[in-house]
């Protein structure tokens, strides 16, 4: 879902001066120029922005794989399983703390900028930051109380890892909000780099330093402590980025609040956020809950390798969401169809290029994590096939949420996420990790099919790569009649 979107485009002062951001596309565009930009160059901008985002994703993915590989080898498969299990919960709670604002900001801020409503843009940013901070700290308090109550039944390593993980939640949530604001202001590289490069790079540096200096025991608590420190650093960098990218017009107005309008789509987005994270982490959480933390670590490593094939789709989505928001606000349905089709093809081509070598090299890649992790090779194959199918459908979730259909999107995703978790729990008992992989992939396929049906029926758009083929007969008939 994404939570990661960004072609952004909208301001006043930079438009007059012709200022551009990294990659060559406008940092900000005046409200009077946005129609021309999206009417004539949406696909070109989408492609250029997607390439820039993909470059960051590739570098970040490589660093993430190296970081996870080194951490797994340093702390071992058992402790890595504990770390992966705790990290899955921390990520889930971090996204829950955003209350869906990290997605809705990508809809509201570009729309307000397109209309020159700077007071509302400033208002929604301030409002979301305050609500998220309060929610995250409440989750921390509840989490600490829960861990204290269950401490007697938890292994010391698991209990301490959870405490460190819970402390990470506020920093993760505030970083997600800050990154969304930066992307809405036009920062693709600047918003993605801290999360994709700095966080994992710093975490790896901390773990490696402790390892070589023999400064602390090598277990899951070390990895979680490194995650906490790197999350704090990333939040600081994102705040600096937002301050640098903020349009000057935003600083000269008093914030105006429209909380009721903001909560209406945000509540469904909260459901989407929880469901999306649950679906992607259901296997690791299910394995951990059943006491199979070692298998959870192996599955997490396999999932991390397979996720490389999702990078092109994520990169396209980065540029897709604000573009859809602006086109929908302008009532440009033709532009929506054009950009949606372009996004699907970019996603599929990029995913296919990543999937083929990954399927061939899954075994040796996992061997780098350690001998125990080779058991995850079949899991990589199953998960990659699901990612290829999802890529052919394009970033459909963004198309649904950015056109005001959050409730429908939330319902579809919630049903699929629940099915994914239930399927993992049921399949693990009989087929272990492989069963969890099948449940995850089948749910991903079902989710994309359900979204495609909704988009076709409700938005009257053809989703995925089949759109141009569906339109061919109609165009031919029109040409035959001289239309």
Give residue ranges: language-model regions.
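Transmembrane helical elements of multi-pass membrane transporters/channels
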Residues: 49-65, 198-199, 223-246, 253-322, ...
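Membrane-water interface segments that mark the loop-to-transmembrane alpha-helix transition
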Residues: 11, 18-29, 48-60, 86, ...
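Interhelical loop/hinge segments that connect adjacent transmembrane helices in multipass membrane
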Residues: 14, 26-46, 216-226, 234-280, ...
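Helix-loop junctions and terminal segments of transmembrane helices
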Residues: 99-115, 184, 302-331, 337-340, ...
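Signature of the first transmembrane helix
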Residues: 19-32, 44-103, 140-144, 168, ...
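Membrane-interface junctions at transmembrane-helix termini in multi-pass inner-membrane proteins
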Residues: 172-197, 384-413
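Interfacial segments at transmembrane-helix termini and the short loops linking adjacent helices
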Residues: 38, 42-47, 148-165, 293-294, ...
């Amino acid at each position: 879902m994404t939570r990661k979107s960004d072609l952004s485009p909208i301001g006043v002062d930079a438009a007059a001066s012709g200022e551009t951001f990294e990659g060559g596309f406008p940092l900000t565009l005046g409200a009077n120029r946005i129609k021309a930009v999206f009417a004539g160059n949406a696909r070109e901008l989408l492609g250029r922005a997607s390439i820039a985002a993909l470059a960051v994703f590739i570098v970040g993915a490589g660093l993430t794989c190296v970081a996870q590989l080194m951490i797994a080898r340093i702390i071992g498969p058992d402790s890595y399983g504990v770390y992966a299990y705790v990290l899955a919960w921390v990520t889930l709670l971090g996204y829950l703390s955003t209350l869906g604002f990290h997605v809705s900001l990508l809809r509201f801020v570009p729309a307000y900028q397109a209309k020159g409503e700077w007071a509302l843009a400033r208002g929604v940013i301030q409002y979301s930051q305050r609500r998220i901070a309060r929610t995250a700290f409440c989750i921390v308090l509840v989490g600490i109380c829960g861990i204290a109550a269950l401490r007697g039944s938890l292994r010391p390593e698991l209990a301490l890892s959870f405490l460190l993980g819970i402390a990470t939640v506020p920093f993760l949530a505030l970083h997600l909000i800050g990154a969304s604001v930066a992307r809405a202001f036009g920062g693709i590289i600047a918003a993605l780099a801290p999360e994709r490069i700095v966080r994992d790079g710093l975490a790896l540096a901390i773990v490696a330093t402790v390892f070589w200096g023999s400064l602390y025991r090598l277990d899951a608590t070390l990895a979680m402590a490194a995650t906490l420190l790197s999350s704090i650093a990333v939040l600081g960098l994102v705040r600096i980025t937002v301050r640098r990218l903020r349009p000057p017009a935003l600083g000269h107005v008093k914030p105006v609040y429209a909380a009721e309008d903001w909560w209406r789509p945000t509540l469904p987005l909260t459901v989407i956020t929880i469901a999306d994270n649950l679906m992607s982490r259901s296997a690791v959480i299910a394995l951990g809950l059943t006491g199979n933390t070692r298998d959870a670590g192996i599955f997490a490593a396999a999932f991390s390798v397979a996720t490389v094939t999702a990078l092109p789709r994520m990169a396209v989505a980065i540029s897709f969401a604000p573009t859809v928001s602006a086109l929908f606000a302008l009532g440009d349905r033709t532009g929506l169809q054009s950009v949606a089709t372009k996004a699907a093809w970019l996603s599929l081509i990029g995913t296919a290029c990543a999937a083929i070598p990954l399927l061939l090299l899954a075994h040796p890649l996992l061997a780098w994590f350690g001998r125990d992790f080779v058991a995850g090779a079949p899991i990589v194959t199953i998960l990659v096939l699901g990612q290829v199918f999802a890529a052919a459908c394009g970033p459909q979730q963004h198309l649904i949420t950015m056109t005001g259909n959050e409730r429908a999107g939330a319902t579809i995703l919630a049903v699929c996420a629940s099915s994914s978790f239930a399927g993992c729990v049921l399949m693990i008992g009989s087929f272990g990790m492989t069963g969890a992989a099948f449940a995850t992939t089948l749910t991903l396929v079902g989710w994309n099919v359900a979204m495609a049906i909704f988009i076709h029926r409700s938005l009257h758009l053809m989703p995925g790569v089949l759109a141009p083929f569906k339109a061919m007969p109609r165009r031919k008939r029109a040409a035959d009649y001289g239309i």
